[in-house]
Amino acid sequence: ELGVSKDKAESLFQIYHQRVPFVKSLMRSVSNRAQQRGQIRTLLGRLCRFHLWEPNQFGMHKALPFEQAVQEHGPGIKRAYTYKALNKLIQGSAADMTKKCMLDLYKEGIVAHIQVHDELDISVESDKQAKKIVEIMENAVTLEIPNKVDYESGKNWGDINE
């Protein structure tokens, strides 16, 4: 589908994990937490639940609630979809941060017209207000590595995306 051979894909995957080795251990750690606890928490504490179960053996199986999974597959079951835990952590935390930005902006009387993923479309009255918006967004969530906000302006949204 991607026009890359299996060998090339495996090589790229191996190079990636050599260059950023913490990703694999983070992925394993978050997946294990989801498996053991049935949930993970995003950066701001929102719960992402893993409430469905599937058989331990590899294959195509429908994920089921615990009682149904035990009835259908017996005791050899595990939580389903825990391989998605890292993605839920990252995407969920990004969503938390965007929502926190929107809330902080709202408290200052600034309302976004639309949100698209981690992007906000806001009517801005002046350069001073634009700087205030950037400052609010960069400080909405305190992290060890500071947040950076990219700001673009134009007469309309179409002008910005050309």
Annotate the PLM regions.
Residues E1-E162:
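Conserved catalytic core of nucleotide polymerization and phosphodiester-bond processing enzymes
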